Amino acid sequence: MKDVAHLVFLYTMKLITITGPSGAGKDTVARMLSETGGYQVLCSYTTRPKREGEIDGVEHCFVESCNVPRDKMLAYTQYGGYEYWTTIDQVKDKAIYVIDEDGLKALCEKFQDIELFKICVTAWETTRLSRGVSQDRIDRDKQRKLLPLAFYDAVIFNNGTLSELRDEVQRVRYMIV
């Protein structure tokens, strides 16, 4: 019986995914979208070390190793030599998931019945550098396998002010059914 309930849950799940390079504003967009609309922001597990200013359980759940079976994962990816994943059990109903492109492709292939709204957040390299992203991280991002912009339901170019970003997020919010 649990399996049937689980399948029904997956079929009715609504998920907003957000991808983009380091420093583009993915987490900021996720927070803005979650403020209204009843969406929870999923906290990915990761084996990477915590960065300065990050809070365990907010940006990520920091762990030493991954011991979750793959069939219990919503998505899994490796990036920069570290593992990132989210479990299916973390999703209650409507959720926002900040994920990389490989993870998004795998999610789309694994769960074809999930209602997805895919957002790409991007910013110029100079903007990202001004936000404190290192040149090494920018260079690493250049090695990512990018998805064509047409793959996404919405693209946010985050090169302006916080107020301009709020306006863009509001525009996207109207697109989410």
Task: Please provide the spans of the model-predicted regions.
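Small-molecule kinase domains that catalyze NTP-dependent phosphoryl transfer to phosphate-bearing small molecules
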Residues: R131-I176
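Conserved phosphate-donor/acceptor-positioning beta-strand/loop module used by diverse small-molecule
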Residues: I96-I99, D113-G132
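Walker A/P-loop
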Residues: D27
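ATP-dependent small-molecule kinase phosphotransfer cores
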Residues: S44-G103
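P-loop (Walker A) phosphate-binding loop of NTP-binding proteins
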Residues: P21
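Post-Walker A helix-loop "phosphate-sensing" segment adjacent to the P-loop in P-loop NTPases
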Residues: E35-L42
